[in-house]
Amino acid sequence: YQHVKAFPRYISATHSICEDLEKRRILLENLQDEENKDGDHPKLWKNFAMALGADEKEIENVTLDWFTKDMIDNFFSQARKSYAEGLASLYTYERQIPEIAETKIQGLKKFYGVSSKEGLEFFEAHKSADVIHRAECEKLLDSLSKEEQEKAEQASMYTARYLWNFLSGMTSKHKLETIAA
């Protein structure tokens, strides 16, 4: 939840250092999707967690594990370094989300009996919206200079590492079985 709650601020940080109006508008559209007044994404995540039996106050007050804090700190760091690095960090995450969202929807239905709108809406929203965000980020990344693309690639690698550490940390914390594909 804490990562989902912070995500609009990653976008906002990158948006604020982007000098090109047209590029900022694209980031702004993404930010508006995240903070939609009828269903901001942190609220949708809370609804998902509550559909699984979580308490709303506990969701807000959970103590961050080191791997979650490190991931969030990396996103903020990349988002504030440069437009290219912030954009690449956002892309690294959003690139994979539509397919992950679909897999999560199937798993939540099959293994956890989650079928309510509230329980699935976060993933339904990301299944479609992030296809658009991914394509927009790709166009923006393609428009970077060679030097900016090198910075973006490095930022993407850092972000991927922090995402991996986060997932590994969750797997270890909850003693989940891992199966290599």
Model-predicted segments: where are they?
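Non-heme di-metal
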Residues: Y1-A181
